Amino acid sequence: MEALTLWLLPWICQCVTVRADSIIHIGAIFEENAAKDDRVFQLAVSDLSLNDDILQSEKITYSIKVIEANNPFQAVQEACDLMTQGILALVTSTGCASANALQSLTDAMHIPHLFVQRNPGGSPRTACHLNPSPDGEAYTLASRPPVRLNDVMLRLVTELRWQKFVMFYDSEYDIRGLQSFLDQASRLGLDVSLQKVDKNISHVFTSLFTTMKTEELNRYRDTLRRAILLLSPQGAHSFINEAVETNLASKDSHWVFVNEEISDPEILDLVHSALGRMTVVRQIFPSAKDNQKCMRNNHRISSLLCDPQEGYLQMLQISNLYLYDSVLMLANAFHRKLEDRKWHSMASLNCIRKSTKPWNGGRSMLDTIKKGHITGLTGVMEFREDSSNPYVQFEILGTTYSETFGKDMRKLATWDSEKGLNGSLQERPMGSRLQGLTLKVVTVLEEPFVMVAENILGQPKRYKGFSIDVLDALAKALGFKYEIYQAPDGRYGHQLHNTSWNGMIGELISKRADLAISAITITPERESVVDFSKRYMDYSVGILIKKPEEKISIFSLFAPFDFAVWACIAAAIPVVGVLIFVLNRIQAVRSQSATQPRPSASATLHSAIWIVYGAFVQQGGESSVNSVAMRIVMGSWWLFTLIVCSSYTANLAAFLTVSRMDSPVRTFQDLSKQLEMSYGTVRDSAVYEYFRAKGTNPLEQDSTFAELWRTISKNGGADNCVSNPSEGIRKAKKGNYAFLWDVAVVEYAALTDDDCSVTVIGNSISSKGYGIALQHGSPYRDLFSQRILELQDTGDLDVLKQKWWPHTGRCDLTSHSSAQTDGKSLKLHSFAGVFCILAIGLLLACLVAALELWWNSNRCHQETPKEDKEVNLEQVHRRINSLMDEDIAHKQISPASIELSALEMGGLAPSQALEPTREYQNTQLSVSTFLPEQSSHGTSRTLSSGPSSNLPLPLSSSATMPSIQCKHRSPNGGLFRQSPVKTPIPMSFQPVPGGVLPEALDTSHGTSI
C-alpha cells in the first residue's frame, strides 16, 4: 500500500496543480470508509492523463469530497459545493440512502451522475430502489449492474433439488431484497426458513440450546444440513466455526455462501472451517489474454490494477473496479464530444438559489455517455434504456480435493445475465475422482507398518511395510498415484494447548496432505477433526518385556516342597522308626509263647492280600513281617512314601519347567502391583491418552488404570515415558522396563529381534483399529472404506498380515504364552492328607499291638503246663546276650567247670527217636547250653573235662530235670523242633584252648543239642 501511495504521489500533485484553464473537471464523492475508492479514482485519472490517444492535450481535473456513511444530507451539501465549482459529471460510491438523495439533486441540475453501489459492511448487496425522475429524465447511471443474486440462488437450489433449507442473514442485509426470491420459492413449493444472525454469533447458538428442547434441537440440526449464508465473509467464517464447535453441523452438511464480493483467501478460510460440503457464489470478471491483459481497446491500464502478479488486484473490491471503469467511460465520452466539436462548457451552479437553472449541456453529455461502450477491468460496460449496466457474471465454486492443496474449491459452473447457468452443480461419481490423481500422503516411520527401503542416492525415498502394501493395493484398485513424505515432527497427532494439532493430523488439517497412513489408530478426538476409513487391522495394547533369565540354584532340588513339608517329613522318619522298633520288641516277646507253627507267606488270605498291597506300593510283599500292627505301620509308611515321592517327582519337573519359562508379568494387574520393573509408553500418543482418560476417570471402578497412570505420568511422563516407539523397544530390550504399545508393533519387534530376548504379553484393552486418515469432509473416505472391505473379503489383507507377522518366525512368541506367574512350592496344607494317613496308620498299629499283647497275655495264663514244653532258643540267646553285656561273656570259661545235664532219652516217641542225629565234624567246637534257671543253679552249667572226648558228663544234680521242648533257629532262618529228652545220655566235649568262640555270643547262630 505504501508503494502504491508513493507511486501515486507525483500524479496527485500534478492533478492539484493542473492548469486552471482546463476544460475537463469532474467531481467525486466517497464515503469515509472507502479509502480504496479514493486511491483507485485518482489512479484512473492519472492513467487517462497519460493517454494522449483519448484526450490528446486535454487533462482531467477533479475534486473529491468525503462524507459519512449513510448521511444523505451531507452528500447533498458536498455535491452542491462541487457544482458551484463547475463539473461536467459526478462520480460517487455510496450506499443507497445517499444515492437516492444525490439522484434527486443531479436530476434537477442535469448533471450526469455515475453511481457505484457499495456493499454494506461486506454483506451481500441488495437492489437500490432509486426515485423516478419527475420529468422522466434520469441523470443517474448505475455503473454497477443490478443485483441478480436472487436469480442465481433460485437456479442453484433447483439444481441441488433442495426442498427444505434455512437462510441466514445479518443486520446489514436488507431483507426486502429477498421478497422476489421468496415469492418464486413459494410457487415452486420450497420450504424456506429465515433467521437473522446477530453480530455476536455465539449468542445465536447459545440461545438455541437454552430455548429449544432436545427434539426441537434435533429437528433444527436436520434443517441446518442445508443452509444459505447471506453474510459477510468474516461473519460466515465465525458462524460455521460456531456451528461445528456446538455439534450442530455434520459431515453431510451443505453450506451455500452467497456474496458478490469474496476473495480467494477468504474462500479457503471458509472451506477449511466448514464441516461437510461448501458451495460459494461470487461475481467474476472476464480475464484478458496474457499479451493484452493491461490493454483495453485503445487504453492501457496501470499494471497495479491489471497484472495479478502485482498482488494489488486481489486486494481491490468490486466497487473499486467499477469506479475505475466509470472514469474510463467518462473519458471516452469526453473524447467523442471533443471529436464532434459539440463541447459544452462547464457552468457554476448554485443549488440553494431557486432561480438557478440546470446545466444546459447536461442532456447532451448524458446522451453521449449512455451511447458509450467500453471494455475495462469489469469487462464490457454500457448502459441500457433503464440506465443500468446489464453485464454481470457469477461463478459457482464447490468443494474439491486437489493433489497439491488437499481440500480446495473448484469451479462447478457459471451464470451470466444472458445465458444463465453454464455447467452442472451435481457432484461427479466418486469412482472417477481418484482415477489419474496424484495424492499427497503423510506418514510416520513405525515398524512394520512403514519403514524406509533401500534408497538410491539422489532419488526420492522409498518406503515399505504393511501399511505401504495396503496403500499400494488401494492405489492399484482405484487407479491413483501418490507422493509420500514423513511428518516433520514424526508424531501421529496430538491436540496442543492452543487447540491446534501436531503430527500427521496437523498436516491433514492444514491441507498439506490428502491422507495419512501408518500405525495410526482411530480415536474420537481425531475423528472430530479428520475423517477415517474403515479399519484395516484391529488394535490392542501389549506389554513388551525382556524374557526372564534362567534361574540356576544348587538347592533347586528342595524347591518342590515347602520348608514345613520337609520338616514334617524329617520328623516322621524317627517317629516311624521308633514305632517299628517297639513293635519288633513286642513281637519278640509274643513269639516266646507262640505254640503254633507259622504258615508260609502266601498260605493265608491276609498274607496274600499283603503281597498284593506290597506290589501296589512298589515295595514287594515278600517281607517276613507277620504282625498285623507291623503290617499296618509298614503299609501306612509305604503309602506315605509313594505319595511323597510321586508328588516330589511331578512338582520338581514342573518347577524346573516353570523356572525356564518364568514371567513375572502376565496382565496389567500384575504390572500395576509389582514394584521391581518400571513401565511407560510414548508421550502424547493414543496409548498415553487412553491411560490418562481411564486413570483420571472418577467413575472407573478398576483401580488398575489409576495405578498405571500414576506411574506413567510420573514427573509429567519424563521419568518412564519415551519420545518414540523405537526408544521404548530399545529400553525394553535392556531389561527391567515394560513398554506399553500397539501389539502389532511390539510383536514385530519381538519376532525380528536378533537375540530373541523379548516377549510380548497381549492384553486387549479397547476395540479400536488402524485406519487411513483423510481430510475432514473428504469424498474419498467411502471409496477407501469400500476397497478395504473388499480386500478383507478376498483374504488379501490376511496374506499381507502373514507376510509381516509370520506364525513361524525365527523367534517364538508362544513359548511364554502358557507360562504361570512363578513356580509354586507345595505347601504343608497340600500334604495334610498324606500325613493324616500316616498318623492314622501309626495309631491303628499301636492299637492293634496293644490288643495283641492283651490277648496273648490272657491266653498264656489260661494254658496248663504240659510235660512236653518247648524252649525258645532265640529267647535264650537274647537273654545270654544281655548277660554278656554285663561282661560275663568276656570272662574265660574253664573247661573243667562245664557240666551238661543229661536229658532223658527214654521218653522219645517212636517217630522222634528215628530222627537222625546231627553230627558236627568240627571237634574243636565249643558248645554251651542254656537251660531255664533253677533255684539251686546258676545261669551256667560246667562240664568236667577229661582227656577223652567220649567221657560221660555227669549231672551236677542228682535230680532229674523235667522234660523240656526246645527250639533253635536253623541256618535257613527256620526253627528246628527238638524232641523232648527223657534219659540222660553222655555227651562228648572237647575244650577249646583259646577261650570262648565269638560265634557262641552271636544270637543269629543256632545250636543243636
Swiss-Prot record:
One of its GO terms (cellular component) is AMPA glutamate receptor complex. Keywords: Calcium, Cell membrane, Disulfide bond, Glycoprotein, Ion channel, Ion transport, Ligand-gated ion channel, Membrane, Metal-binding, Postsynaptic cell membrane, Receptor, Signal, Synapse, Transmembrane, Transmembrane helix, Transport. InterPro entries: ANF_lig-bd_rcpt, Glu/Gly-bd, Iono_Glu_rcpt_met, Ionotropic_Glu_rcpt, Iontro_rcpt_C, Peripla_BP_I. Residues 21-436 are annotated as: Interaction with CBLN1. Residues 931-960 are annotated as: Disordered. CDD domains: PBP1_iGluR_delta_1, PBP2_iGluR_delta_1. Glycans are attached at N131, N200, N422, N498, N724. Residues 943-958 have a biased composition (Low complexity). The chain crosses the membrane at residues 563-583, 638-658, 831-851. It catalyses: Ca(2+)(in) = Ca(2+)(out); Na(+)(in) = Na(+)(out). One of its GO terms (biological process) is phospholipase C-activating G protein-coupled receptor signaling pathway. Residues 931-942 have a biased composition (Polar residues). Its main location: membrane. It comes from the Eukaryota. Belongs to the glutamate-gated ion channel (TC 1.A.10.1) family. GRID1 subfamily. Homodimer. Interacts (via extracellular N-terminal domain) with CBLN1 (via C1q domain), and more weakly with CBLN2; the interactions mediate the trans-synaptic adhesion complexes also with neurexins and are required for ligand-gated cation channel activity. This is Glutamate receptor ionotropic, delta-1.
